[in-house]
Amino acid sequence: GPDRKRGRQTYTRYQTLELEKEFHFNRYLTRRRRIEIAHALCLTERQIKIWFQNRRMKWKKEHKEEGPAAS
């Protein structure tokens, strides 16, 4: 059956705040920085990477160029 081990990750308020703060300063992380954050927040590098990918997608949607909307 489907692998139940990995459900949707929920982040604590603290983790989210820290990730948002980091994103505010740079939308792309260096590997070194990702490792530091992973250690600081007790998350895996993979989780950090995915969070940033998702956050960038969200950011792009929010900052769409005003123009003809090609849906």
Curated annotation (Swiss-Prot):
Belongs to the Antp homeobox family. PANTHER family: HOMEOBOX PROTEIN HOX, HOMEOBOX PROTEIN HOX-A7. One of its GO terms (cellular component) is nucleus. It comes from Ovis aries. It is found in: Nucleus. One of its GO terms (molecular function) is RNA polymerase II cis-regulatory region sequence-specific DNA binding. This is Homeobox protein Hox-A7. Sequence-specific transcription factor which is part of a developmental regulatory system that provides cells with specific positional identities on the anterior-posterior axis. The keyword Transcription regulation applies. It comes from the Eukaryota. Residues 4-63 bind DNA.
